[in-house]
UniProtKB/Swiss-Prot annotation:
This is Bifunctional protein FolD 2. It catalyses: (6R)-5,10-methylene-5,6,7,8-tetrahydrofolate + NADP(+) = (6R)-5,10-methenyltetrahydrofolate + NADPH; (6R)-5,10-methenyltetrahydrofolate + H2O = (6R)-10-formyltetrahydrofolate + H(+). NADP(+) binds at residues 173-175, 198, 239. GO terms for molecular function: methenyltetrahydrofolate cyclohydrolase activity; methylenetetrahydrofolate dehydrogenase (NADP+) activity.
Length: 297
């Protein structure tokens, strides 16, 4: 089963979609600057030397600037105390130039990440992790939505159309970052939603019933071809680095080369990943508009 079995039309090109979204955001930021004399500002806080986090923060910084959004990068040493980090968040909460605050996870082990996230002003919580935003999302109220699930939903609607009502969606993974908010978004679209995770006894059978299959477990190639219903739309959120024949490559949670019978699938890399940063900047633009009571369009 070679990769040639997956027709080009079945590949969901997240890179292309994200580029279009970024073009739209850039144009809106320019218009806002002309009308208000101000631009949205995003503060990103990185604690310690985690190499993957440094790469992510660098990429976010570049793309933020490219969209015309002000980027404030705070790189703190690994030994930063809880009090020091909370004090920085408190300063950013009241800084009028900062409309969105993102704390890059994971934090060093001695820091309480949940306490840090809850310290962020919910109106500046562009990652959508604050309990206020999570609660609003769960009860169907306007909220900042975590960037990865939001990106997944945009890709689904681009492929399936705006109306997802009645489709059976299976979400594999129950993290607060992807799985749980994804379930809430799909419920809001009137999908029938099943959530499965590492303790689920019959995960393959459940997945085989899915019209929409979203996989976010961090286990390379866990979902095999026979887990996928013919014609299903598969969104692979996994980003796993694997070593093979002395080389390192990035793969998803789905055995991509076995998914030729899927109706559509996101590749890894180039699927969900680019959407996450685009949605972060979209949330930052929304935060600016809400804080200044200006129309986003």
């Amino acid at each position: 089963m070679g990769m040639d079995r997956i027709a080009d039309r079945a590949i969901i090109d997240g890179k292309r979609f994200a580029a279009g979204l970024l073009d739209d955001i850039t144009a809106r930021v320019k218009k806002l600057e002309e009308e208000t004399g101000q631009v949205p500002g995003l503060a990103v806080v990185l604690v310690g030397e985690d190499p993957a986090s440094r790469v992510y923060v660098g990429s976010k910084h570049r793309q933020t600037l490219a969209a015309g959004i002000a980027s404030f990068k705070y790189e703190l040493p690994a030994e930063t105390t809880q009090e020091e980090l909370m004090a920085l968040i408190d300063r950013l909460n009241v800084d009028p130039a900062v409309h969105g605050i993102l704390v890059q996870l994971p934090l060093p082990a001695h820091l309480d990440a949940n306490a840090v996230i809850q310290e962020i002003n919910p109106n500046k919580d562009v990652d959508g992790f604050h309990i206020s935003n999570a609660g609003r999302l769960a009860t169907g109220q306007p909220a900042f939505v975590p960037c990865t699930p939001l990106g997944c939903l945009l890709l689904l609607k681009d492929r399936l159309g705006a109306n997802l009502s009645g489709l059976h969606a299976v979400v594999l993974g129950k993290s607060n970052i992807v799985g749980r908010p994804m379930v809430q978004l799909l419920l809001a679209e009137s999908c029938t939603v099943t959530i499965a995770h590492s303790r689920t006894r019959n995960a393959p059978e459940l997945c085989r019933e899915a019209d929409i299959l979203i996989v976010a477990v961090g286990r390379p190639g866990l979902v095999r071809g026979d887990w996928i219903k013919p014609g299903a739309v598969v969104i692979d959120v996994g980003i796993n680095r694997v070593e093979a024949e002395g080389k390192s490559r990035i793969v998803g949670d789905v055995a991509f080369e076995e998914a030729g019978h899927a109706g559509a699938i996101t590749p890894v890399p180039g699927g969900v990943g680019p959407m996450t940063i685009a949605c972060l900047l979209s949330n930052t633009l929304t935060a600016f508009c809400r804080q200044h009571a200006v129309n986003i369009d």
